[in-house]
């Protein structure tokens, strides 16, 4: 490689020589006034500036000086001057070449690092790392050069400079960080990597500790392999260094005053982590393998052992540390936002705004980290308002394969399973540093763990450790991997274990005797034979002032009455506080009208609308000591311009959230407009709600139709978390729902899907039809000693419907009614048909009935579809003894809405002489038509059919 090739490369750069004068002028302008240049150029110039302490100066005076010197050359010997100039130019070019070489090692050294423990991936020949490529020759090796920002002596021989950068960047650690635009962060990483390269990483005692951790990692796997032959355990073998990695992480955390670590991980290595990191009793684990379960666990459906979570307190470096391993399904990476939400709730409880006391740790697989979209959503939340947890430590157990799909560190062109070179490349969007490390070098693993934890502590930012390893067995222990990866598994069969390699190294170093590895292995195995854990000192669940007693939230039943009323004095006082604006605060005229109307509503001069009732529900809860967390993509204003929880000064742009000023603790009310994510955000809120039962956590969809973007969270956590894991959750979901001619993407919150998931009183599905019902439903969610998910089909056009209003005494005297009977004074004896319905269609029905002057049809609203209010329903049937037709009306298609999930309940409590009928749109593969006139015709037909008798149920219900 020659200097000419480097010149060719430079000439193809976007900053090429032809633009040098332009760039030079821009840089001088930047030095004079940084804000005078474009933001992109400003960021670039800051990135190339020298470290703190060195100051760049404008070059134009220097160029002028050189011009003057050139003119004065005529006064000296032309030959001598030319010789000196050539020498100076060569020296300057050599010095520049050395600095370029250092920089290229920082940028591309990771590509030549020895990361693959199997040695299957050939070490890349990166031309930028060849000194000759930069014009440096063998005769330059002993010449001294300035080292620039290299964390070393100011001047060193080129040979020593190359030795340093090779050791730092191309050994068993590959560091990626040069894309970070914050110079302080970049320099910090450089200093730590380069400044400690030849220092001993571990003392002899620490090396022994690491060996002990590896003995435990290997020991549990071999024990289970021999004792429970053929049973799935998703072994960690090949990635054994994860155990000393986590041990070091916890030691550092405890030394810094961290109180809680919440871990999220998939199935790979989970049992190993449970026993050797969290200290789960091996005896309890063996019982799970043998099918022995406690009586309490058999009261629910349960889950497989490698999905189960665990919580405990451990003692490490003389300090107590609370560890949590989150429950999770097999849907890879979906636990990530759940962990972040749980961590956030713990931090808020401790007023830990920076994230110093609670740390999230996420353990990923390489294939899933690169492939699952929720990874990006969770990363994008990391610095979002209301979602930051002070930085997450991400650990990739990179075994270079996903079930049978290869994801090697280096892949042959045309055989890639992903587009990006590394599975970690998505993290670059955060400018998070990535430390790739060879899993068969445990000391390097411990070093990068310290580096990662220190970076997180210093900058409160996400950091990635890519543990490059392999999978010794198949996807599970019964699988045969050699059928699809014959070359890889031939190499794996010959590969000594990490424990064997490290033990041999320590024996050769004289750190341990040659018999010690076998003694460690035997001691660990003997402990397992006794069902004891010798790898971790556990304290059990000690608890502290932040510990939640969840038994207090299982005392009530779903039908336990709750006093959700509010005294008139309290209501009017809170309303006055809520709608008193700061001085000199100018509202938009439309918002001002809403606030002025709410003052009149509180005085009883206007009927109450939905926005007022909702706001007062939150105000009452905050005053009573509960917290409210209301989030969604347009939540502060409300998708339909009805809420205005945060108001804006139209002159200054300042904003103000009245509910945050009801209590001295502003944490009690949080309202956030979130990034455009359903899955990640809903997962976060689920995690938050399962950790803090005293917070009303509400996620609101922009339109209910978009909730299916988070279907995995709904299916695997919200609907089934209690049945599988015994996890209580009071999460509330607001799904704007209603057929109003807006087409198939803005009509339905898919109530049928939620109702299909309902069983065992696992959650509540409600469709409130009045502001007062909304008020009481919200307050009921917190006032009962019960925590169940609440799914609400919320209104759209009803927010301003002239009939959908309430009055003050509805709030001061009422409670949530699971079913609302006929409101007109009908002669019960004359009623021939009872129409049951839910939601917006009720108002179409009563308007049509009034227009037709029908007195033979009673219209009843079922406000809670699940759990089904059987007693209320039976009372309505009994109230109309001559009504032999019971009809269900819904505006959704027949195969959607509540009909298919509710008809058996409607039928079950009818007498033999009752007919069950229905009136719906005809079945459809989509939710709604896209044409307004067709929609209007369909709606009229549904209402007409309901009042006239509908269709009979054929073949029973």
Where do the language-model regions lie?
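Active-site cores of enzymes that catalyze phosphoryl transfer or operate on phosphate-rich substrates
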Residues: 198-220, 291-340, 344-351, 658, ...
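Hard-cation-handling environments
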Residues: 498-499, 509, 513-628
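Cofactor-binding active-site loop characterized by glycine-rich and histidine/acidic residues
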Residues: 259-435, 640-692
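Conserved phosphate/anionic-ligand binding catalytic regions in large, soluble enzymes, centered on
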Residues: 101-117, 244, 248-277, 364-384, ...
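Subset of Sec-pathway N-terminal targeting signals
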Residues: 2, 9-51, 55
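Glycine/aspartate-rich loop-and-adjacent alpha/beta segment that forms the canonical ThDP
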Residues: 105-108, 112-164, 172, 281, ...
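Thiamine diphosphate
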Residues: 2-7, 16, 389-514, 727-730, ...
